[in-house]
Structure formats: structure tokens, C-alpha cells
Amino acid sequence: MKTIIVFLSLLVLATKFGDAKEGVNQKQKKEVTQNEFREEYLNEMAAMSLVQQLEAIERALFENEAGRNSRQKRCLGENVPCGDNIPCCGKLACEKTAGYGWWYKSPYCVKPTSG
């Protein structure tokens, strides 16, 4: 109990006499914050303009890439039904075959016959 009273009395004394130079401290704080905010604000504005420029460049690059269809579209493998809407893979051809085709009445993706 005695230690609590000692600490509370020290706390009261520290808060009472802690800010003896309040006017000087406030002026210094104001000057420091004004200078810091001025420099930081200018630096932040420069960084924001740089970010906006980079975003514009990135947007332009991605627009060009999206227009080129750089990725191959999905396609079907061998011995799979195909049609106008469902393409076969690059080296396969969509043909009516004597195997599955007669039963399902649809063309299938097969290796192209030479001849």
C-alpha cells in the first residue's frame, strides 16, 4: 500500500511540474511539425504523381497485351466430340469418323490423315 502511495504522489508531481516550459515546447513543436509536413507533403505529392505515371504506363501495356490474345484458347484432346463452338487442339482436325461418329452423329477430334 505504501508503494502505491509513493508512485501516485510521484505521478502527481510529474504531471504538475513536468511541463514547466510549455510555451517554448509548443513553439518548437509547431516549427518542427510545419517543416516536416511541408517536406513530407511535397515528397508525397511527387511520389503520388510518379505512381500515377507508372499506373498509366502499366495500363497502356496491359491493354495492348489483352488485345493480342497472347494465351491459347482452351481446346479438346483426341477422340473427343467437336463442332463449330468447340475447337480441337492445334494439330488435331475435326472430322467425321467411322468409329464413334456413326453412333453419336458428331465429328471428333482426330489426327489428320495424310492423303
From Swiss-Prot:
GO terms for cellular component: extracellular region. Ion channel inhibitor. It comes from Trittame loki. It comes from the Eukaryota. It is found in: Secreted. Expressed by the venom gland. Its main location: secreted. Residues 21-74 form a propeptide. The presence of a 'disulfide through disulfide knot' structurally defines this protein as a knottin. Keywords: Cleavage on pair of basic residues, Disulfide bond, Ion channel impairing toxin, Knottin, Secreted, Signal, Toxin. Belongs to the neurotoxin 14 (magi-1) family. 03 (ICK-30-40) subfamily. The keyword Mitochondrion does not apply. Disulfide bonds join 75-89, 82-94, 88-109. It holds the Pfam family Toxin_22. InterPro entries: Toxin_22. The keyword Transmembrane helix does not apply. Residues 1-20 form the signal peptide. One of its GO terms (molecular function) is sodium channel inhibitor activity. This is U17-barytoxin-Tl1b.
